[in-house]
Amino acid sequence: MQNSAQDYLQQMLDMVRQSGHVAIKYLNKSAPAFKKDFSVITKADKEISKLCRGALSKTLKDPAHLLLDEEDPHMASYLDQRRLEKTSFLWALDPIDGTRLYANRMPLFGISLGLLRELKPWLGVVYFPILKELFYCDGQDAYFVQNAFGSNQKRIKIRPIQEKLSGKSLFFCNDTFYNKFAWRDKDFHIMINACAVVNLCWPAIGRGVGCFLKCSLWDFAGSWPIMRKAGLDLRSMKTGQVMDQVHADLFNRTSKPWELKEYQLISSQKHYSQIKSKIFEIPTRNIYS
């Protein structure tokens, strides 16, 4: 018999809770190293990946389920539309999002786990162990939990926020933003956190008005259904088209498999045009000339 949304959600919550313990355990002895693409990997990344893969081992015996794990060396082989269309449930795990921050013992890192159904965002869980903050979507509603997994935890339902853009508003960008873009900051300002799940989850509760990124599926899969319940969507910077499901053609296949091809602007429909007007592409420069 197929599990219910609540069954899957409880499993996901258990996984991120245990993963949080692992992240805290290795925070001061993370043994950071570099991957081939020069991104950082730590002992916690490896241990959390192993933990979650073990927790899902029985589920993954069903060919209807597929796990996309940032630390899986075979992940590129899954980027095939015909295979994806045969996958009813696509799990996407980022063991430590904000790994560079984690490796420097900073608290802004999270554990992200998303479950897509028929390639559309469905369930999502994002946990910030040091902050003791949890965001999750149960398929119907999304919630923000303070003092998560504690006896005094406080759960708040996430709803669309009707905030007017002003001088106090913050818009989040990734750490490579200024390599290609500039920002007209007359009305409101940008902030760079170097952590995708911070950029995606915080605006869902009014900490910022949106974000700009080009990342991999595991970076945003957990946050995706959560932010949609807050009225925020992934929109193409080029066309403004909303991304509402996964398709292989949206992602790079070679240098960085599963990274989005296009930059995305995450915001409410109301704010999209105003925020986009603040971003402009700068001419490519040869830094050696």
Segments predicted by a language model, with ranges:
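Acidic beta-strand-loop-alpha-helix segment within the catalytic core
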Residues: 113-201, 250-289
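Short, well-ordered coil/turn elements that cap or connect secondary structure elements
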Residues: 62, 184-187, 229
